[in-house]
Amino acid sequence: MNLLLLTFGDNTDNHQQAVFAALSFMRDPHIRRVLVVTDRPDFYRWLCGTERNALSTEEGGEDASGKHGMAAAVEILPITAETLTSWQGPQQFFWRIKIQAVAMAVRQYPGQHLLYVDSDTFLAGSLADMVRQLGAGAAYMHCFENRLGDRNSRTLTRTRRALVGRTLEGIMLSGRHEMWNAGVIGLPASTAAERVAQALQLCDAMCATDCPRRLIEQFAFSLALQQGTLRSCQDVIGHYWGNKAAWNRLIAGFLAEARLKDETVAQAVARMGQVDWRALPLEHRQRRWVLRLKAVIDWALPPKKLRHFTPG
């Protein structure tokens, strides 16, 4: 199975997340290749290093089933700013690029299972069951979130009003259709090309309506993959979108130690076995009034003293 990550821009936090995610997935022998679609290939030179030797027992090179394997090969698929603009399509919907990156990987390696993950994810269990289910034709997304008919957010309400009753790409939309989190997308080799093409068509069709765009690419994948068996994987893959600041600190420390110790990629992959995935919450949301109070305090009580270096 191939793993796919999409990264872009100059924010090093995002790229460190991607490296950390890749290392966590490379512990599992079912991941044979890591594909990184990025406009900053220079950030992945260490990850692409040649010292990805087999993980020994002492290094912890095994998955939850006890199998040993090689650290996965890493392949960079470079893209340009022009590519990113083109991928946004005629309606210039930014997150259409996710669907295009998945389509690119499917074309690059047809006939192979593909697991796309957002950079802010990690593997904490075994992929053995997922691989079996993919082989049987099931697809994966991270987790079920809600149905279009649910009334738990303004964005969902606006989406429902714009889409329910429409027929898009042969699908008559109703309040029963489900929204799944697209932080993980697992595609079986047997239907990957077909489902990605359908997701792209659904995305473009929704962009042509007055539907709010924030969830369009996620709903497009959800609709396309609901045409078959769709499963959750949140019991083995963590998605810390709701607590990035805390996880970024953990990741920065992990990668700094890897470089200070001059670890090989294989050694860093093995050290992933020491990470306590339950130590930090995946989601940590403050009440709005707390955030406002902090802002007022910062404004009313500025630092007592600030001093910068002055060259002689």
What are these regions (language model features)?
Residues 1-88, 107-110, 286, 290-312:
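N-terminal anchoring/stem segment of glycosyltransferases
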Residues 15-19, 92-95, 99, 119, ...:
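Conserved glycosyltransferase catalytic-site signature
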Residues 27-32, 104-115, 189-194, 227:
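Secondary-structure boundary elements
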Residues 35-38, 113-118, 123, 140-141, ...:
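A structural signal for short, well-ordered beta-strand segments and their strand-loop junctions
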Residues 98-150:
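GT-A fold catalytic core of metal-dependent nucleotide-sugar glycosyltransferases
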Residues 131-192:
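Conserved catalytic core of nucleotide-sugar-dependent glycosyltransferases
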Residues 168, 172-259:
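Catalytic core and acceptor-binding pocket of nucleotide-sugar-dependent glycosyltransferases
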Residues 250-312:
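Long, low-complexity C-terminal extensions of enzymes
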